[in-house]
């Protein structure tokens, strides 16, 4: 099964995210490419709603059906939608590749119809000591977003 998300946002930030899941309960490979970012790390999350009527703000909170605290992708305690950070170079471009065991393209952890968001700041992965660390990773504003949809095989 495959899915895709075309992300657009403020100040020329844009990207495309592709998801591939070989088996129903298998891990999901995530490949993303971005342009227009400031150099450095940017939080990257699946948010709960597929609603972008008010830009990225109407996408809701991180996708968290298991009601956990925010964490890193490799943590046992994390939101399903916590995918860590995208790292942009000095040219503003970034490539992200990861395989994740919590997100899915089907079932109760399905990300289909939800919104991908890239944030202005680094996600502290729940370890920053800020009041928002265990909620959002203190990643700041939402730079670009898009709704995840099924892709043609």
UniProtKB/Swiss-Prot annotation:
Cofactor binding: number and manner: Binds 1 copper ion per subunit. Binds 1 zinc ion per subunit.
GO CC annotation: cytoplasm
Keywords annotated in UniProt: Antioxidant, Copper, Cytoplasm, Disulfide bond, Metal-binding, Oxidoreductase, Zinc
Cofactor: Cu cation; Zn(2+)
Binding-site list for Zn(2+): 62, 70, 79, 82
Main location: cytoplasm
CDD domains xrefs: Cu-Zn_Superoxide_Dismutase (cd00305)
Documented EC number(s): 1.15.1.1
InterPro entries reported in the protein's UniProt record: SOD-like_Cu/Zn_dom_sf, SOD_Cu/Zn_/chaperone, SOD_Cu/Zn_BS, SOD_Cu_Zn_dom
Reactions it catalyzes: 2 superoxide + 2 H(+) = H2O2 + O2
SS bond list: 56-145
Compartment(s) where it occurs, according to its Swiss-Prot or TrEMBL record: Cytoplasm
Entry-linked SUPFAM superfamilies: Cu,Zn superoxide dismutase-like
Binding site for Cu cation: 45, 47, 62, 119
One GO MF term attached to the UniProt entry: copper ion binding
Functional summary from the UniProt entry: Destroys radicals which are normally produced within the cells and which are toxic to biological systems.
Family assignment from sequence similarity: Belongs to the Cu-Zn superoxide dismutase family.
Subunit structure: Homodimer.
Protein name: Superoxide dismutase [Cu-Zn]
Protein species of origin: Schistosoma mansoni
Taxonomic placement: Eukaryota, Metazoa, Spiralia, Lophotrochozoa, Platyhelminthes
Name of the gene: SOD
């Amino acid at each position: 099964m495959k899915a895709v998300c075309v992300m657009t946002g403020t100040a020329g930030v844009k990207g495309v995210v592709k998801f591939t899941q070989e088996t129903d309960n298998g891990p999901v490979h995530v490949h993303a490419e971005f342009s227009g970012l400031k150099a450095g790390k940017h939080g990257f999350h699946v948010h709960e709603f597929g609603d972008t009527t008010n830009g990225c703000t109407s996408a809701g909170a991180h996708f968290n059906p298991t009601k956990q605290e925010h964490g890193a992708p490799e943590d046992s305690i994390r939101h399903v939608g916590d995918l860590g950070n995208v790292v942009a170079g000095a040219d503003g471009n970034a490539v992200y590749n990861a395989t994740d065991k919590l997100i899915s393209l089907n079932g109760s952890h399905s990300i289909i119809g939800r919104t991908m968001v890239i944030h202005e700041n680094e996600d502290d992965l729940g370890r920053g000591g800020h009041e928002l660390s265990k909620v959002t990773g203190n990643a700041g504003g939402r730079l670009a977003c898009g709704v995840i949809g099924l892709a043609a095989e």
